[in-house]
Amino acid sequence: MKGFIDDVDYSVGLLDEGTNLGNVIDNYVYEHTLTGKNAFFVGDLGKIVKKHSQWQNVVAQIKPFYTVKCNSAPAVLEILAALGTGFACSSKNEMALVQELGVPPENIIYISPCKQVSQIKYAAKVGVNIMTCDNEIELKKIARNHPNAKVLLHIATEDNIGGEEGNMKFGTTLKNCRHLLECAKELDVQIIGVKFHVSSACKESQVYVHALSDARCVFDMAGEIGFTMNMLDIGGGFTGTEFQLEEVNHVISPLLDVYFPEGSGVKIISEPGSYYVSSAFTLAVNIIAKKVVENDKFPSGVEKTGSDEPAFMYYMNDGVYGSFASKLSEDLNTIPEVHKKYKEDEPLFTSSLWGPSCDELDQIVESCLLPELNVGDWLIFDNMGADSFHEPSAFNDFQRPAIYYMMSFSDWYEMQDAGITSDSMMKNFFFVPSCIQLSQEDSFSAEA
């Protein structure tokens, strides 16, 4: 099955039964070693299709609006658009990206908490009416620049207020909601619903209980003031595991039945991001420099070998000014795998991993145990599909890694069963035979 050909900026390889993603990574490591290329990603688009099927099976009553800033790679957006998800956009560029795919404006939400006036005007121009708001100043800005705006009032959760610094800045209190609703009435701004967000790091199911209870209170307040609200956005916070999704559904499903029952006219939506893409992308990085240091130079409390053994600092060709940008604000939740084969009884050494910038902030892994590696060896990082695809920094002449998209035949058939056809995908699929050894000339990739 050689698929179809269109003038596109990327290709997607179809893997036969004898080829897996490990084989693909091996081939590209070989190619990049020969040509001295940069780090690269391999994206398994079939995993995105599987995540959507999982979502439909577990929480079919909640419509997903994919958070574009999480990963705006064109192949990702095209697959999700073909699957029928909505999109949560934070900027004009993101809105334009998804509208170019034919996504109707009603399937787009403008979720930036701090909106530029020019971008509010752009949303008005292209018909993106649904947006979020959590304060009076933002509400007035919307009123002046978007006459058809339909606003979701963003309320804080106990999770936000309780100490997660990245989220506590956004979302209004329940106490302040009546004031904002009255302001909206005076400004003639239509409030159509409520949004809240619970972090994926939150382990307390009671946070959802309180958030949904608060949302119901806001709906009741709005009714008293004269608004008819019809949308509830339960935010993101989905890690990507079926277990976590089922756990969340176990908590919220009975509450939704009580507070927003079927037939109430309230549409339930969510903003999954990393849920869809995290596990779909693997990053391969090359070691470009190495230092031998004393073991006691590593901070106490980290995983170390004996003090009389050497420790190593390895510098890679990607770091926080590239694909590991999220490391600046959160801990890395993936452990590197050594690509080369080594013996089971080979000694392990205390090691730290760094990006290429020589900046003290550019530390990727503080401490881990690895066999001794050499310059030119490769490390593989799984679960790198979320927050890794930002514009490359000019720091240290960083270049964006290539992305090689793949999918198994079984996933391709599953995609067709889901209603995605070649015409709707507009992709250039090609067949990847088993055990193929790729060279520079017969490479079938395209840079993102």
Swiss-Prot record:
<comment type="similarity">
    <text>Belongs to the Orn/Lys/Arg decarboxylase class-II family. ODC antizyme inhibitor subfamily.</text>
</comment>
<keyword id="KW-0539">Nucleus</keyword>
<keyword id="KW-0832">Ubl conjugation</keyword>
<dbReference type="InterPro" id="IPR009006">
    <property type="entry name" value="Ala_racemase/Decarboxylase_C"/>
</dbReference>
<dbReference type="InterPro" id="IPR002433">
    <property type="entry name" value="Orn_de-COase"/>
</dbReference>
<dbReference type="InterPro" id="IPR000183">
    <property type="entry name" value="Orn/DAP/Arg_de-COase"/>
</dbReference>
<dbReference type="GO" id="GO:0005634">
    <property type="term" value="C:nucleus"/>
</dbReference>
<dbReference type="InterPro" id="IPR022657">
    <property type="entry name" value="De-COase2_CS"/>
</dbReference>
<dbReference type="GO" id="GO:0042978">
    <property type="term" value="F:ornithine decarboxylase activator activity"/>
</dbReference>
<protein>
    <recommendedName>
        <fullName>Antizyme inhibitor 1</fullName>
    </recommendedName>
</protein>
<comment type="function">
    <text>Antizyme inhibitor (AZI) protein that positively regulates ornithine decarboxylase (ODC) activity and polyamine uptake. AZI is an enzymatically inactive ODC homolog that counteracts the negative effect of ODC antizymes (AZs) OAZ1, OAZ2 and OAZ3 on ODC activity by competing with ODC for antizyme-binding. Inhibits antizyme-dependent ODC degradation and releases ODC monomers from their inactive complex with antizymes, leading to formation of the catalytically active ODC homodimer and restoring polyamine production.</text>
</comment>
<dbReference type="InterPro" id="IPR022644">
    <property type="entry name" value="De-COase2_N"/>
</dbReference>
<keyword id="KW-0620">Polyamine biosynthesis</keyword>
<feature type="site" description="Not modified">
    <location>
        <position position="69"/>
    </location>
</feature>
<dbReference type="InterPro" id="IPR029066">
    <property type="entry name" value="PLP-binding_barrel"/>
</dbReference>
<dbReference type="InterPro" id="IPR031178">
    <property type="entry name" value="Azin1"/>
</dbReference>
<dbReference type="GO" id="GO:1902269">
    <property type="term" value="P:positive regulation of polyamine transmembrane transport"/>
</dbReference>
<dbReference type="InterPro" id="IPR022643">
    <property type="entry name" value="De-COase2_C"/>
</dbReference>
<comment type="subunit">
    <text>Monomer. Interacts with OAZ1 and OAZ3; this interaction disrupts the interaction between the antizyme and ODC1.</text>
</comment>
<dbReference type="GO" id="GO:0042177">
    <property type="term" value="P:negative regulation of protein catabolic process"/>
</dbReference>
<dbReference type="Pfam" id="PF00278">
    <property type="entry name" value="Orn_DAP_Arg_deC"/>
</dbReference>
<dbReference type="GO" id="GO:0005737">
    <property type="term" value="C:cytoplasm"/>
</dbReference>
<dbReference type="Pfam" id="PF02784">
    <property type="entry name" value="Orn_Arg_deC_N"/>
</dbReference>
<dbReference type="GO" id="GO:0004586">
    <property type="term" value="F:ornithine decarboxylase activity"/>
</dbReference>
<dbReference type="GO" id="GO:0033387">
    <property type="term" value="P:putrescine biosynthetic process from arginine, via ornithine"/>
</dbReference>
